[in-house]
């Protein structure tokens, strides 16, 4: 049995979007599950819309997701000689022909067919020409599609789909300027690269019978096809920019872990029992094309956010720290200027929904608060709480065993002496050291900050209260 080989073949006309990333993931998983190869091909024949910037964004998105490829990236613009060679071969064998019909004639034909409630299709006028009409311009090249019979596609997702050749027209495989068309290049590339399984959106299904006929005209069996349903927004319409972030790298910038995005993408059309959270290894071992749903999936941002929280919570702190460092760097924070990043992660894993949230809540570990959150300050930094801050400062200044347990005892002792509930002491301390009302448990927070920074910040808060009171 031939080694399984799948491919992802984006057009570099924009970013790596959610739908494309899901297609790449499904192709990658199937190859990895079966010990095969995954190929990356850049379909850049549309020279007007293709940009190097888009190529870079696609490659960056693939890298961030961890979807490594065994071959490529291949570029179609580097293969024009091969397309010309096979176009000529089809012409020589009578399997393609030159079409001289003008745009005006084709437009009129289309209008007439639509007026007669017929399916618009080329009528084959040039099919049997032996020489160019007088005054004709440069021709396009059309594939001579069979006129009768059927094309049967055994689709791994949709099952058997049957197309009648009589309903297919003679598609253009090369434009008048000689550039090849999508339907031709994709067949040639998949043939030359030995692609065995093609996973793609079901909007390509109508191209499939034409491509199958092209494969056979070129003397090869077509690959196995798996057409996956589209992704819808919550309003039931096809997912687009109006539904929010659709670029993979936007989710990176918003603080999502790549494995959380992959987990969400795999669940957009595939399931395994009632399991929701999957590691990448689990996805590889469980995924199969036959298990993909037949109906469209709805993109739910809240579900993605929940999965991100689950992955942050379950990951090793060192793994999360790698990605958190990027977000801290974006905020001009050097993690070397504070407590170990892994410890900062471990203290916040249970609560953080995104790495952006974790980064924002981690800033005070690396630099003194520039000011206090107004509402938290009004409630917790006032003359009535100054005694608690002074007591905690004095107890902590004498503490040599700077561990969470010992710190907790100091805060507890201050509360007992002042006959206050623990929160009435801990919260002013929290606002004093962090600048806001939210942090990990106060003993963990102070342990991570260290003795010097803790005492300095508590004293700064005491001084701030005195200045406010003095007017």
Curated annotation (Swiss-Prot):
Zn(2+) binds at residues 99, 101, 126, 128. The keyword ATP-binding applies. It is an enzyme of class 6 (ligase). It catalyses: tRNA(Glu) + L-glutamate + ATP = L-glutamyl-tRNA(Glu) + AMP + diphosphate. One of its GO terms (molecular function) is ATP binding. A motif ('HIGH' region) lies at residues 10-20. This is Glutamate--tRNA ligase 1. The lineage of its organism: Bacteria, Pseudomonadati, Pseudomonadota, Gammaproteobacteria, Chromatiales.
